[in-house]
């Protein structure tokens, strides 16, 4: 299927309206205004559409970013039509985005995602070979779309160097680091079969971490947990938030997500 997917830049009002329709279908919430997207496209932004036999099945919307003297492409939104998810369409779009961003003169792309969405973590870190060093608690405030409602909108900031330079520091050592890594907190299955973190574990945010690598479990089906056990979803959010913030503050970065089984994946901190 992927060989038939065409990813191209979108610029016309008609193309943008098509993107907004798909955005509404995916998130069931307010869409980015046309005038804002047009303004972004004409000022360093980039909108890509993935088409299968002339049907828009995915898109990516990014705008120019500039912080602390550094310019980059900020990839604000990646959306894939439900029936085409987990087929590699998102990865295809992101690689095309990286290629065009380089042609536009960008050296880096950044974006955010919910770290408890492990499948997104697998795409971002393991497939795309990005890294993250920053945790953003309740980044967007309260969100009411089906994916984000009922919990703080925590995010981690992903960085993707166009020339892959930073990642090369870890790339050849990933397997070795995974073998050596210490698991920060244990997990188990609840009586109804949902993954849960150790109830008796108290994380000390004042402890100094000295190992070369650590592993942090995250659920593979966080949306299911949110529906079936909101209190368990909250537990995952607040416990992992503290761990992320502590390790990032001590200079660690997330560079990989390992899928060990159907219940959890493990972020690799180095």
Regions found by a protein language model. Give the residues of each.
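Residue-level recognition of the GNAT/N-acetyltransferase active site
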Residues: 81-83, 114, 219
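A conserved beta-turn-beta hairpin within the catalytic core of GNAT-like acetyltransferases
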Residues: 65-75, 85, 107, 209-216
């Amino acid at each position: 299927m992927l060989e038939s997917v065409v990813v191209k830049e979108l610029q016309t009002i008609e193309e943008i309206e098509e993107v907004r329709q798909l955005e509404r279908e995916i998130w069931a919430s307010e869409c980015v205004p046309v005038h804002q997207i047009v303004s972004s496209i004409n000022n360093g932004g980039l909108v890509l559409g993935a088409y299968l036999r002339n049907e828009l099945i995915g898109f990516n919307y990014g705008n120019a970013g500039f912080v602390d003297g550094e310019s980059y492409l900020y990839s604000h939104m990646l959306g894939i039509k439900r029936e085409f998810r987990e087929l590699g369409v998102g990865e295809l779009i992101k690689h095309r985005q990286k290629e065009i961003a380089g042609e536009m003169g960008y050296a880096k792309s950044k974006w955010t995602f919910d770290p408890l969405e492990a499948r997104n973590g697998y795409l971002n870190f393991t497939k795309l070979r990005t890294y993250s060093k920053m945790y953003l608690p309740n980044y967007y405030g309260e969100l009411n779309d089906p994916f984000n409602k009922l919990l703080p909108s925590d995010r981690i900031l992903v960085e993707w160097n166009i020339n892959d330079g930073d990642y090369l520091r870890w790339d050849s050592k990933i397997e070795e680091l995974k073998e050596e890594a210490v698991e920060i907190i244990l997990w188990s299955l609840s009586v109804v079969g949902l993954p849960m973190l150790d109830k008796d574990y108290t994380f000390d945010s004042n402890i100094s971490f000295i190992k070369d690598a650590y592993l942090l479990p995250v659920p593979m089906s966080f949306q299911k947990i949110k529906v079936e056990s909101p209190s368990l979803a909250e537990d995952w959010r607040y416990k992992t938030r503290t761990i992320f913030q502590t390790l990032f503050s001590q200079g660690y970065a997330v560079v990989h997500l390992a899928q060990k089984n159907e219940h959890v994946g493990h972020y690799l901190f180095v």
